[in-house]
């Protein structure tokens, strides 16, 4: 029920939403039933956690995560596996692109600050 709540009931705390997001993705991988894939996913998640959290520093990305996770869950509940997989891929690609933009912006700010 975390992801399928009205907008007014969404948690604005990026750190908490980041933890829920991580659990959501781990649950999806675990549901596939491949223990080795789940183990590898957990290992990768541990390694990239600090970078992934950048995605939850902006309210727009928190809202988008709620919307995207809700759509993925609805597709799964309706047994539309291909649609769920497509939505999940799009969600991950969007998140990666946003984190990349945030990272580049932070690097730019650091360079500008260092040049002063």
Each language-model region and where it sits:
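C-terminal effector-binding regulatory domain of bacterial HTH transcription factors
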Residues: 82-116
């Amino acid at each position: 029920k975390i992801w399928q709540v009205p907008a007014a009931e969404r948690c604005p705390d990026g750190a908490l939403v980041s933890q829920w997001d991580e659990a959501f993705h781990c649950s999806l991988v675990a549901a596939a039933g491949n223990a080795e894939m789940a183990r590898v996913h957990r290992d990768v998640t541990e390694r990239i956690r600090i970078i992934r959290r950048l995605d939850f520093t902006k309210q727009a990305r928190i809202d988008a995560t709620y919307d995207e996770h809700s759509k993925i869950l609805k597709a799964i509940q309706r047994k539309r596996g291909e649609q769920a997989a497509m939505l999940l891929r799009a969600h991950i690609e969007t998140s990666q692109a946003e984190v990349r933009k945030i990272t580049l912006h932070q690097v730019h700010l650091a360079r500008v600050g260092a040049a002063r």
